[in-house]
From Swiss-Prot:
<feature type="region of interest" description="Disordered">
    <location>
        <begin position="422"/>
        <end position="443"/>
    </location>
</feature>
<feature type="region of interest" description="Extended PHD domain (ePHD)">
    <location>
        <begin position="682"/>
        <end position="807"/>
    </location>
</feature>
<dbReference type="GO" id="GO:0008270">
    <property type="term" value="F:zinc ion binding"/>
</dbReference>
<feature type="binding site">
    <location>
        <position position="1054"/>
    </location>
    <ligand>
        <name>Zn(2+)</name>
    </ligand>
</feature>
<dbReference type="InterPro" id="IPR001965">
    <property type="entry name" value="Znf_PHD"/>
</dbReference>
<dbReference type="Pfam" id="PF05965">
    <property type="entry name" value="FYRC"/>
</dbReference>
<feature type="binding site">
    <location>
        <begin position="998"/>
        <end position="999"/>
    </location>
    <ligand>
        <name>S-adenosyl-L-methionine</name>
    </ligand>
</feature>
<keyword id="KW-0479">Metal-binding</keyword>
<feature type="binding site">
    <location>
        <position position="975"/>
    </location>
    <ligand>
        <name>S-adenosyl-L-methionine</name>
    </ligand>
</feature>
<feature type="short sequence motif" description="Nuclear localization signal">
    <location>
        <begin position="77"/>
        <end position="84"/>
    </location>
</feature>
<comment type="function">
    <text>Histone methyltransferase. Dimethylates 'Lys-4' of histone H3 (H3K4me2). H3 'Lys-4' methylation represents a specific tag for epigenetic transcriptional activation. Methylates only a limited fraction of nucleosomes of target genes (e.g. NAP and XTH33). Involved in epigenetic regulation of the floral repressor FLC and FT to prevent the transition from vegetative to reproductive development.</text>
</comment>
<dbReference type="GO" id="GO:0042800">
    <property type="term" value="F:histone H3K4 methyltransferase activity"/>
</dbReference>
<feature type="binding site">
    <location>
        <position position="1001"/>
    </location>
    <ligand>
        <name>Zn(2+)</name>
    </ligand>
</feature>
<feature type="domain" description="PWWP">
    <location>
        <begin position="315"/>
        <end position="379"/>
    </location>
</feature>
<dbReference type="InterPro" id="IPR050701">
    <property type="entry name" value="Histone_Mod_Regulator"/>
</dbReference>
<feature type="zinc finger region" description="PHD-type 2">
    <location>
        <begin position="739"/>
        <end position="807"/>
    </location>
</feature>
<dbReference type="GO" id="GO:0032259">
    <property type="term" value="P:methylation"/>
</dbReference>
Length: 1083
């Protein structure tokens, strides 16, 4: 035990001497304990800091060094300092200051000032406080005695020290009744810990719901969130990445890469945020006061108040019902006579009066006590039932609201009540042993809960045919339809017909359309009797013919005439219901329907609703080269191989690459995955994990990318002209399936390897294309020599691919540094001195009013370009206050121009573009060069932006105008657009603002020639999604072997020149000198 005391400060030498004496004393005669008075008293002879150890103990405790006080020699102008031990002394009352004479007398008498103070303060204590201090001291002594006994202190010594010493009394008096040293110290530690907890809780991030009232919508940008989808019962994580001012929707990007615009008030969203961030962003915790799971709370209260008339519960009243172990749920009271024949529900429960209810949303029946039912209005006002977070609660609230508005139950609820009161319920349950013993029935003290049977949940009833499930349209196989009818997969229906056991009785038959498990492409028709016997066939008639034959044998054996007459002669299609006009209308409606829930196709393709093979993980690629073919990855367009663009997914393909032999004649074209008869769930490629793209079916019923089928050696196309189906998937080497892609890291699919002989790097073909690796043809020029009409077997081109390390770079691109040097030299150009002397005395030259001539013009433009930023020209009214360019551009409110849904042809799309381009585009100062064009509204990838118009001239005329006229017009520029070798558009003096679009090596637009009503037009298309107020650019591809134009786009992948270097390189390889030509001779 370490004892501490207040000692006067000594000199450094004395301090050293005290330490030595302590150690010497402990070594010669170890002391087991010491009197507390000797420890705490300053006047004690052993005025030292002692360290006591038990005999035989090896544990050593180092003594703490306390600050030593000065000598107690009295000084005329300074009093001795009092050292406080363990506790902080409160401020004492002011007392009379002793004179110098009194202090001298006290010193002569041998009484120290500290002792006198202690005695005076001890005398001032009253009796009550003294008793209180004694009780606290006894408590402290009990605690301290245990610690001393552990250190080996004798119990007799403890009794001696029971009387509180003077120093202890002084501490008590000075502290004015505070807690003991240890307790005060623990209290301070507790306060510190509480402060740490409060600080940690304030900075710790938690998932909470926030309020949107009085908060800037832009404050939510950057916050992590998770969105609850009720129909999936899943929280999807994501983050807020933007805010649309026009629609007032926030842009949410999910963890799987998908994004959508949401109104946060209408969704169930939680944010990951701390208290400090909430205070910084001026946010508050959200509640369900305004909107309750999509339902207007005020409207529900008004409807419930107008609906509720009496206090007692009666049939058809809407209530809140509570089942044990379940949340309160909206329900309707059902008449007792409705389900009097249902087993279990007609039993009276103990505990008083009971009511029969049916729940909204789940449509389950239950019998509960009256005390378990709450008025619907009372429940809404208390808000306690509205805290339910189950996915079906929102659906139940919608049905309850509809019932309050129209006083009409959903069709399924009404039908179940009718079925329960008829023999239909007994027929439905005839295949079961006993409905009361089924797992769907629930009975507990005071309540009975019965779920409706599965076969009773029929969607449509047409005569004696009950359709339970319509199924889904199959588009990956042509065998699920014939010339007259379509057979949806999963179609389920029931019908009453002659029983196989008793010809005089009737039974229920269940009919289904399934997929063959072996072939996976053909349907299987199955009919199941109430006894469980099944009849299968490849057509509906094949199934029912087996049943007809069985019935005929039974009738012949029993000498019973045909009961139903012509009933046995109806076809299987009639028995399934496919020939019924109403059923056919329902099936045709499936072709145009989409999933009605919030679960979109991207969530299906993301892997949450598909049974993916082991190792599969979808890979989504944001293609930057939208102007290139998705199959061959080339951007050239030819007269016999035009481009096609899907109007829905904006994918670009060549007609030959996709196998589109029939011309589309100006009609908007859709790919196989975007057509109305396409799959509800986009199929995945069986050769790679990349989602989307140009896909075709395989011979084994799956789908694959055309690019994957071309690059993988084992696969091929059975019909090269139609580019389908893909064959040879099963012939792919097993070792190729085991390769791991070095780019995406997904083990799913078949990979190719680097063409270098010593390299074994593997990757998927589309992953390599997205990563920018060299995936090209060995002899690309030979591709144009191939003929599609000739079916020659030797028409093939070798395909090469190289990894990042071995990719072949062209030496022609190394001249980029040399190309930009002349522009640097021009920027450093210094104008020559004026030959006429001082320029201020020179008359104004009207011939030079358009600016300085070359090279002064280029030098000035190069230096000025360093300080120019994009500044669109915005037409606005007079304003007294000045606004920054950012506020004028990004703070303006422009209405979004939506594309009409009735556009069905390219001509209508072209007309809409011509009518709206003035509202969508604006010109202004460009940071690249001169003036430019800016988008006032966002544009989607593939949208028509503007038409390039001007004067149509021949190439020789264009060359003469450019060299003789336009080159001398400094500041005017030249705007020549070459269509082909015979036509050039001159937009210098005539045309639209499209000629102001600048060049960029990484453009966001591209140009295409389209045909509208027999006329050709040059259209600028959006290559990717163009943001608001973004400058429009496209690649000029200036073709000239001798002349080089410097590029100032400033993008990281800038090639330094405006010239099309690849085309010039190909052109240089084609041309050869005359001396290199050889005379051609026939062999």
């Amino acid at each position: 035990m370490i004892s501490m005391s207040c000692v006067p400060k000594e000199e450094e030498g004395e301090d050293t001497q005290i330490k030595t004496e302590l150690h010497d004393h402990a070594a010669d005669n170890p002391v087991r304990y010491a009197s507390l008075e000797s420890v705490y008293s300053v006047s004690s002879s052993s005025s030292s800091l002692c360290c006591k150890t038990a005999a035989g103990s090896h544990k050593k405790v180092n003594a703490l060094k306390l600050p030593m006080s000065d000598s107690f020699e009295l000084q005329p102008h300074r009093r001795p300092e009092i050292v406080h031990v363990y506790c902080r002394r409160k401020r004492r009352r002011r007392r009379r200051r002793e004179s110098f004479l009194e202090l001298a007398i006290l010193q002569n008498e041998g009484v120290e000032r500290d002792d006198r103070i202690v005695k005076i303060e001890s005398a001032e204590l009253d009796d009550e406080k003294e008793e209180e201090n004694k009780k606290k001291k006894q408590k402290k002594r009990r605690i301290g005695n245990g610690e001393l006994m552990k250190l080996g202190v004798d119990s007799t010594t403890l009794s001696v020290s029971a009387t509180p010493p003077l120093r202890g009394c002084r501490i008590k008096a000075v502290c004015s009744g505070n807690k003991q040293d240890g307790s005060s110290r623990s209290k301070r530690n507790t306060v510190k810990n509480q402060e740490k907890v409060v600080t940690a809780s304030a900075t710790a991030k938690k998932w909470v719901r926030l309020s949107y009232d009085g908060v800037d919508p832009k404050h939510f940008i950057g916050l992590q969130c998770k969105v609850f989808w009720p129909l999936d019962a899943v929280w999807y994580p994501g983050s807020i990445v933007g805010y649309n001012v026009e629609t007032k929707h926030h842009i949410v990007k999910y963890g799987d890469g998908d994004g959508e615009e949401l109104a946060l008030r209408r969704e169930k969203i939680k944010f990951l945020i701390s208290r400090d961030d909430m205070e910084l962003l001026n946010m508050k915790f959200g509640t369900n006061d305004v909107v309750v799971d999509g339902q207007d709370y005020d409207e529900l209260v008004i409807l419930a108040a107008s609906f509720e008339e009496c206090q007692d519960f009666e049939p058809r009243d809407i209530i809140w019902a509570k089942l044990t172990g379940h949340a309160m749920w909206p329900a309707i009271i059902v008449d007792e006579s409705v389900i009097v024949k249902r087993k279990g529900l007609n039993n009276k429960i103990s505990g008083g009066r009971s009511v029969l209810v049916q729940f909204f949303g789940t449509h389950d029946f239950a019998r509960i006590q009256v005390k378990q039912a709450v008025s619907f209005l009372k429940g809404l006002l208390s808000r306690s039932p509205l805290k339910c977070k189950q996915p079906r609660f929102e659906e139940a609230m919608e049905e309850a609201k509809m019932y309050l508005k129209e006083y009409k139950l959903p069709g399924r609820m009404d039908q179940l009540q009718k079925v329960a009161d008829t023999d239909c319920s007994e027929r439905i349950n005839s295949g079961e042993e006993d409905s009361s013993n089924s797992g769907d029935d629930y009975t507990k003290d005071g309540e009975v809960w019965l779920r409706p049977t599965e076969l009773g949940d029929c969607l449509h009833r047409i005569g004696d045919l009950q359709i339970i499930n319509l199924g889904r349209i199959v588009t990956d196989s042509e065998f699920f339809k014939d010339s007259k009818h379509t057979w949806p997969e999963g179609y389920t229906a029931t019908r009453k017909f002659i029983s196989l056991k008793d010809p005089n009785a009737s039974a229920m038959y269940k009919m289904e359309v399934l997929r063959d498990a072996e072939s996976k492409t053909r349907p299987v028709f199955r009919v199941t009797t109430n006894s469980g016997e099944q009849f299968k066939g490849d057509t509906p008639s094949a199934c029912w013919n087996k049943i007809y034959n069985r019935i005929k044998k039974i009738q012949i054996a029993s000498d019973n005439p045909d009961v139903l007459g012509e009933g046995l002669h109806e076809s299987g299609t009639d028995m399934f219901g496919f020939s019924n006009p109403e059923v056919d209308k329902l099936i045709q409606g499936l072709l145009q329907s989409r999933p009605p829930s919030k679960v979109s196709q991207r969530k299906y393709s993301s892997g949450k609703y598909q049974d993916h093979p082991t190792g599969y993980r979808p890979v989504r690629v944001e293609w930057k080269d939208l102007d290139k073919c998705n199959v061959c990855h080339m951007d050239e367009e030819y007269e016999n191989n035009l481009f096609l663009q899907c109007d829905k997914c904006r994918m670009m393909v060549h007609t030959r690459c996709y196998g589109q032999l029939e011309p589309h004649n100006g009609i908007l074209w859709l790919c196989n995955l975007c057509r109305p008869v396409a799959l509800d769930i986009p199929p995945r490629c069986c050769l790679c994990p990349v989602v989307g793209g140009a896909m075709k079916p395989t011979t084994d019923g799956r789908w694959a990318h055309l690019a994957c089928a071309i690059w993988i050696p084992e696969t091929c196309l059975l019909d090269v002209k139609k580019m389908e189906p893909i064959d040879g998937v099963k012939k792919v080497s097993k070792d190729r399936w085991k390769l791991l892609c070095s780019i995406c890291g997904v083990s799913y699919g078949a990979c190719i390897q680097c063409s270098n002989n010593t390299c074994r790097v593997a990757y998927h073909p589309l992953c390599a294309r997205a990563a920018g690796l060299c995936v090209e043809l060995a002899d690309e020029d030979r591709l144009f020599l191939l003929s599609m009409d000739d079916d020659e077997a030797d028409q093939c081109i070798r395909l090469l691919s190289f990894c990042k390390r071995h990719r072949q770079t062209s030496n022609y691109h190394l001249e980029t540094e040399y190309m930009i040097k002349p522009a640097h030299n021009i920027a450093e150009y210094l104008p020559p001195p004026n030959p006429s002397g001082c320029a201020r005395t020179e008359p104004y030259n009207y011939l030079g009013r358009r600016g300085r001539k070359e090279p002064e013009a280029l030098a000035g433009a190069s230096s000025k370009r360093l300080f120019v930023e994009n500044q669109p020209y915005i037409v606005g009214g007079y304003s007294r206050h000045e606004f920054s360019t950012y506020e004028r551009i990004y703070g303006s409110k422009m209405s979004q121009i939506t594309t009409p849904s009735n556009i069905l042809s390219m001509a209508e799309k072209y007309t809409f573009m011509k009518e709206t381009y003035r509202k969508r585009l604006a010109f202004g100062k460009s940071g690249i060069h001169g003036f430019g064009i800016f988008a006032k509204l966002p544009h989607r990838a593939g949208d028509m932006v503007i038409e390039y118009t001007g004067e149509l001239v021949r190439p020789p005329i264009a060359d003469k105008r450019e060299h003789l006229i336009y080159n001398s017009m400094v500041g005017a520029g030249t705007y020549m657009f070459r269509i082909d070798n015979e036509r050039v558009i001159d937009a210098t003096r005539t045309g639209s603002i499209a000629h102001l679009i600048n060049h960029s090596c990484e453009p966001n637009c591209y140009s295409r020639v389209i045909s509208v009503n027999g006329d050709e037009h040059i259209i600028i298309f959006a290559k990717r999604d163009v943001a608001k107020w973004e400058e429009l650019t496209y690649d000029y591809r200036f073709f000239s072997i001798d002349e080089r134009l410097a590029c100032y786009c400033g993008f990281p992948r800038c090639r330094g020149v405006v010239n099309d270097t690849e085309a010039e390189e190909r052109q240089a390889n084609i041309h050869a000198s005359r001396c290199e030509l050889k005379e051609w001779t026939e062999s």
